């Protein structure tokens, strides 16, 4: 936050004047006890060895260097050498001016400095409609991209279309089975096929287009025709569902293009040249144990079939060839065992996996309705589609709920609770805070009550504890965006918004606004709340959630 950056600059300058470099392990953070000020730092303890002074002595010299700064209300030495710093009310009041000036741009940063990041997410096989688990991954990925862009990174989002594997063959076979069933042919139910009702219209399409001709073709050819149609229709449905969910992908990347372009063979040759792949027992292996994996991994099975990992190696090699500095993979939590081998893959490609690869795991969603959990299984056709959930609760509620917890934590999604218009509903709680402020301005206009323009003189009236608490929280928003970007954690924005909305609701109940006692005080409080509403709107935009003026 601005306060942290200012304090760091002041301390760094004071240390530099004593010939001391900034200590690496220095912390600047709010103290546990608010009575100790706004920020506390251990800089004197971290720098005492370099300064050749006891920590408290160095802290005292730093205190004296900072004491004259007009933005600081107090600087105190505490304990073994901590510095406790409090800023003036005028400093915090200035935040309202910052928000008013920046508007929709409040919270936009340049910490990314244009670093190129690719975020690949959802990437569900086009074998059926997106389910609610995919929806959570979609919300996390899209919101992360928004956060990274807000922080100054250059971001490209991508959907990897698994169109060349076994699951696609099963889809084709499933459609052909339903086709034969609908046409009246005697059939035996396959052991492994997609049982969802969505397969039946696809089979009917085959009847409408081909009549009984598929029965006259070789099974493999008929299956392939069914597969191609199913893939095309299901992928179109996926794109529509994501569009309705306000999720955008810049690139749709088919796995089949890797094979067609020879990218898999090129990756294999690179691994061979580096002595990181070998033939054994009729199969082709990647020496992933050389990079800490628990065993080497098969790339090509003895029967000649590529493993998923083979395509993933080629795909990630392609990502880095496209010039991305960092690639982010967002996977379901059931892929956690896949992370070590993917890091080994990135290492084999000559990149540092800790710097170049970020894997975000998204845990399961337990969907509740009527107090009971809904059982889901894609293969069995028992699942709640993302489209159904969005239709029932809306994109706003669904996105906010998906981002209401860390992505690697299980999430209970109560369809009934999220539709309630009550303060117990976190989506309503935050959106209503924004609408509440807009309602105050509408009422002021109805009453003919003028609202003075934002100015330091007007904001100087904001001196109560409630005023300052709200101002300090407002000032933390850019820091929240920075933290969410640096840690790839968009849920931090959700947490912040709930905190800010809570402070606003409490402020509203304790402090009269339109009837504040004087026109200037009413205007000052309205300008403060206007800044809060603007910040809520900006934060909700990062989550892909609307900020309605009326509710």
Swiss-Prot record:
The keyword Kinase does not apply. It catalyses: tRNA(Arg) + L-arginine + ATP = L-arginyl-tRNA(Arg) + AMP + diphosphate. A motif ('HIGH' region) lies at residues 124-134. Keywords: Aminoacyl-tRNA synthetase, ATP-binding, Cytoplasm, Ligase, Nucleotide-binding, Protein biosynthesis. One of its GO terms (cellular component) is cytoplasm. Signal peptide: none annotated. SUPFAM superfamilies: Anticodon-binding domain of a subclass of class I aminoacyl-tRNA synthetases, Arginyl-tRNA synthetase (ArgRS), N-terminal 'additional' domain, Nucleotidylyl transferase. Its EC number is 6.1.1.19. It is an enzyme of class 6 (ligase). It is found in: Cytoplasm. Pfam families: Arg_tRNA_synt_N, DALR_1, tRNA-synt_1d. It comes from the Bacteria. CDD domains: ArgRS_core. Its main location: cytoplasm. One of its GO terms (molecular function) is arginine-tRNA ligase activity. One of its GO terms (biological process) is arginyl-tRNA aminoacylation. Belongs to the class-I aminoacyl-tRNA synthetase family. Monomer. This is Arginine--tRNA ligase. The lineage of its organism: Bacteria, Pseudomonadati, Thermodesulfobacteriota, Desulfovibrionia, Desulfovibrionales.
